[in-house]
UniProtKB/Swiss-Prot annotation:
GO terms for cellular component: cytoplasm; cytosol; FNIP-folliculin RagC/D GAP; vacuolar membrane. Residues 392-405 have a biased composition (Polar residues). The modification Phosphoserine is found at S401. Residues 1-25, 392-411, 423-444, 538-569 are annotated as: Disordered. This is Protein LST4. Residues 718-825 form the dDENN FNIP1/2-type domain. InterPro entries: DENN_FNIP1/2 (IPR037545), LST4_longin (IPR041153). It comes from Saccharomyces cerevisiae (strain ATCC 204508 / S288c). GO terms for biological process: amino acid transport; cellular response to amino acid stimulus; positive regulation of TORC1 signaling; protein transport.
């Protein structure tokens, strides 16, 4: 019966409203998390579990789309490992299902429907009759959706023990906030208890939400507490007006008790009630959903050499393809974050870094580069998954049949394909199963390939009539060129787009360094079937046409398979795929035979195995170790002087020890990830690092969110990076008070105990750091940091260009350069 808490009460059906979908575009102030007791002055914390049980749904309902899963489905596995440290990030899945399937790495995803995020508001008042069984009055009951009346409903009176506690209590002035789960149900009850003039008729504001949102309740407590405070002030206002009316009519005395049950708040105050419900439905609940559904970036430890290699490779590719040797966009942006925003974004919760771009791939690559410079980084150990060695006879026979690959160079291997094997490749990519059947490629009907040596060179037409025997189980993703390399009829079009088809490109294809790009080679995702539709950009972009079909689409028509949507030309312009013979486009080597792995590019992070969900990292091992050290401590664990006081009949033995906790341990992130995320379809105020589409709408959302942040702070700051116009702006917004109508000027005007009003004005300051290829006026410290970043990148380039250097020496030098960048401000 308790499992039906979200069902509406029959007596309140007259005030029911139809279900409304939450609006992700709503923004809520992003402030520190705390739980407070209203009058006792104590502080309470609410700890969420790593994953919790989802709401059980008896029958399927209308599906409610989420923000993250569609985006993650179209991000390559390599980029997932860069951003999140894992290929699989579970969304809203029951913890029992995860445990039964071997932890967090399962491939099943539980659907999210509108009932999962339903909520219920309960306002209950004590009647002041402690000896009476019916000591509670139902003041207000609201739920988001209409549920069938045939289902069992739970009455607010049945929740009195959860809301008010034991009916036998002492007469005190207890006012507090409580968070607890309802037994035998998937619901969380958040309650604030207070009283107006008499302690015998306490009032409770209760919010029931799905238990699936429990892990983010503590982190989003400021938004929930703000809504509870707003509702409490509203109810106190109702009681105050009623008391004034009784005083005017002569019906009020000192012993009179003002009760909400004597006021029909739905009839007399419909506007205030509507504001209360809409604030919860369009601000608080969407905020909880955003924190629960949108995955956060994982910041690798600075001593993890595999990550450092990939990070430098990403910087080299960006400079070669995007910036060129003279632009200096990326070094300046990195210096701005190192010298300023790295500390600001951690100390000032209202500061943000937003990348504006119409290309999700480019924005995510830049997010990966910038996030490595931010704190707090993960300090724990990273598990490296061992590669499975296939020693069965089938694998041996497959290796023997593929010996002809050894004598082929990589550039030639990237031009060999088979249209007859495309169907088998598609099936094997979805199943990841290997078989022993070998199929010879057929040269009849094979499409033409183009060899492209440099971005400014017209592709040379070349036929691929060579036949080669390959296993049908092999992934041929490495031979599928992106849509940018198409038929020779439009080669001149690609020549112009390669040179400068995007405003501000500044000939980024010139002066390339092939040795660096060959040192690391990217690995696109093997996902197919579903296609990601690129967001429409605003006016001003050049219109591009792609009339000719890509190789994958042409071969798909021959094999009667559903083609995958090819990347758009604008994506190639902003960040070209590394698919030329100089740096072949190789698929995920984890699905290739062992012999092919030896000649293919091995992504350094491909074996990273991190158990996590959208918000947290699994720390079960550390928790078990800490629990054992607490239960069975050793003298070495104490690490300080201690004293044992023997117990007696009243208490047990007591051990006292000096508590000397250093800053490194206090700042060590163990579970919760920082509020840094990926490219989103809309700007989200809850995250401090993100990317969103470029345009006036996004900039308007950012400005509005900064104004909302000023409700809880006097200063907010945002770094806006526009990849379309190559623009870096530092926008600051502060609130200055011009008058004071209250003697206490140090008190926050939005504090719940402060009723005074103060006039203030908003002042905005915009500083252009980089605009239209020109560097703005920089401070001396920022100029020094820019020079340091440029010299560090040059040193890293020379390090990776030196093929004769020992691998261990390269690792140590790369770690040293990266550490100097991360700790630049501390060292300086």
């Amino acid at each position: 019966m308790l499992g039906n808490l979200l069902r509406n009460k029959t007596s309140s059906s007259g005030f029911e409203k139809s279900s409304e979908h939450s609006d992700f575009s709503s923004v809520v102030p992003n402030v520190p998390v705390y739980c407070k007791a209203a009058s006792t002055g104590t502080t309470k914390t609410a700890a969420g579990a790593l994953l919790d049980t989802a709401v059980n749904v008896e029958k399927p309902s209308e599906m409610l789309s989420t923000t993250s899963p569609p985006i993650l489905d179209h991000i390559s596995d390599d980029l997932k490992l860069k951003l999140f440290g894992s290929r699989d990030i579970p969304y809203s899945r029951p913890i029992d299902t995860l445990q039964n399937n071997g932890g967090l790495g399962t491939d099943k995803i539980t659907s999210i429907n509108e009932k999962t995020y339903a909520f219920r508001i309960l306002i209950i008042e004590e009647a002041g009759q402690m000896a009476c069984r019916n000591n509670y009055r139902d003041i207000f009951d609201y739920t988001t959706s209409k549920i069938s009346n045939s289902m069992e409903q739970i009455r607010p009176s049945e929740l009195k023990e959860y809301i008010f506690g034991s009916p036998v209590r002492s007469s005190d002035l207890t006012q507090c906030d409580k968070i607890r789960t309802i037994p035998n149900s998937d619901l969380v009850l958040i309650t604030r208890i207070f009283y107006y003039t008499h302690q015998y008729n306490r009032i409770a504001i209760s919010l029931c939400i799905p238990r699936i949102l429990l892990p983010v309740v503590a982190e989003s407590w400021s938004s929930i507490s703000s809504w509870l405070t707003q509702t409490q002030k509203m109810l106190i206002g109702f009681l105050t007006k009623n008391r004034i009316m009784q005083e005017n009519t002569g019906n009020y005395s000192n012993n009179s008790v003002i009760k909400l049950s004597n006021i029909d708040i739905r009839t007399h105050y419909p506007k205030e009630i509507e504001i209360m419900v809409q604030t919860l439905q369009k601000r608080v609940i969407p905020g909880l959903r955003s924190m629960s559904e949108i995955p956060r970036l994982f910041l690798y430890p600075e001593t993890f050499k595999e990550f450092v290699h990939v990070w430098f490779k990403s910087i080299f590719n960006w400079i070669e393809i995007k910036d060129g040797p003279k632009l200096g966009f990326l070094p300046l942006l990195m210096a701005m974050i190192i010298s300023d925003y790295r500390h600001t974004i951690r100390e000032l919760k209202t500061s943000k870094i937003v990348i504006l771009s119409g290309n999700m791939v480019v924005a995510n690559k830049l997010l990966f580069i910038l996030s490595a410079l931010l704190e707090p980084k993960y300090k724990g150990q990273i598990t490296i998954r061992r590669e499975n060695i296939r020693s069965d006879s089938s694998a041996v026979s497959r290796n023997k049949s593929n010996n002809n690959f050894v004598d082929k160079p990589e550039t030639e291997l990237s031009t060999l394909t088979s249209t007859d094997n495309l169907l088998s490749r598609t099936e094997n990519n979805s199943n990841h199963n290997y078989n022993n059947s070998n199929v010879s490629s057929n040269s009849i009907g094979s499409p033409n390939f183009h060899s492209l040596r440099k971005g400014w060179q017209i592709p040379n037409r070349r036929n691929s009539n060579t036949s080669v025997s390959v296993s049908s189980s092999e992934s041929l993703a490495e031979v599928i060129q992106p849509s940018s390399f198409k038929s020779g009829s439009s080669s001149l079009h690609y020549l112009s787009s390669s040179i400068s088809s995007q405003p501000g490109s500044y000939g980024s294809w010139f002066n390339k360094r092939p040795t660096i790009s060959q040192f690391f080679q990217p690995s696109p995702s093997l996902k197919h079937n579903e296609s990601w539709e690129r967001l429409q950009t605003t006016a001003g972009n050049m219109q591009r046409t792609s009339s000719s079909s890509s190789l994958q689409q042409a071969t798909s028509r021959l094999s009667l398979t559903t083609p995958q949507q090819s990347p758009s030309i604008s994506e190639y312009d902003e960040y070209p795929w590394m698919g030329t013979p100089g740096s072949p486009n190789v698929g995920d080597v984890s699905h290739a035979p062992p012999l092919v792995k030896n000649i293919s590019y091995k992504f350094p992070l491909k074996n990273v195995e991190l158990k996590r969900d959208c918000q947290r990292i699994s720390q079960d091992d550390l928790l078990d170790e800490a629990f054992e050290r607490i239960c069975q401590p050793s003298l070495a664990d104490l690490n300080s002087t201690y004293e044992i006081f023997p117990g007696n009949s009243s208490y047990a033995d007591i051990l006292t020890t000096d508590s000397d906790i250093d800053d490194g341990l206090m700042n060590k992130p163990l579970e919760l990830l920082p509020k840094y995320t990926m490219y989103l379809t809309h700007f989200n105020n809850f995250f401090q690092l993100q990317a969103c589409p470029a345009g006036q709408e996004s900039e308007s959302r950012i400005t509005n969110s900064m104004k909302i942040d000023l409700l809880k702070a006097d200063y907010t700051r945002s770094l806006l990076v526009s990849l379309r116009s190559r623009d870096i702006r530092d926008v600051a917004l502060k609130r200055e008070f011009t008058g004071n109508n209250n003697n206490n000027s140090n008190q926050n005007i939005y504090d719940e105990n402060f009723v005074g009003k103060r006039k203030y004005v908003l002042k905005q300051k915009t500083r252009k750091i980089f605009s239209c290829g020109k560097i703005g006026k920089l401070s001396t410290s920022l100029e020094n940091c820019v020079n340091f970043v440029e010299n560090s990148i040059k040193s890293a380039m020379m390090l990776y260009d030196d093929n004769g250097i020992d691998s261990e020496l390269r690792d140590s030098e790369a770690l040293r350069i990266f550490s100097s960048l991360v700790h630049y401000c501390n060292a300086g």
